[in-house]
């Protein structure tokens, strides 16, 4: 009676408690949040093409950046978006690191966090430092 079972790695991963996503929902009553969400989707469409955005959003969901409600609303908004082909960046339909960072900034802003010019400068400085370190390390 009252046996304790120890879970191995796979079982604990499967039964892992759901952690809240960075963005759980986009409030319907907040027009600024809706505008930001639409501008973010427009950005993603222009960077990767409309046909690839649902895969990108699914990727963010798998990372824990988006919750169920936020993902559902973004996909609903996406159905009504048309982007002029002349604004779409030619490429593989995938995003680069900078694009993912910008997406994360949109998510933080949708959560009500202010993104100051100082914060953006600090992020840019950190990225330059990392890039310089990688160039020195890998001899690029």
From Swiss-Prot:
Keywords: Archaeal flagellum. It is found in: Archaeal flagellum. The keyword Manganese does not apply. Pfam families: Arch_fla_DE. One of its GO terms (cellular component) is archaeal-type flagellum. InterPro entries: Arch_fla_DE, Flagella_assembly_related. Signal peptide: none annotated. Disulfide bonds: none annotated. GO terms for biological process: archaeal or bacterial-type flagellum-dependent cell motility. To M.voltae FlaE, also to FlaD. This is Putative flagella-related protein E. The gene is flaE.
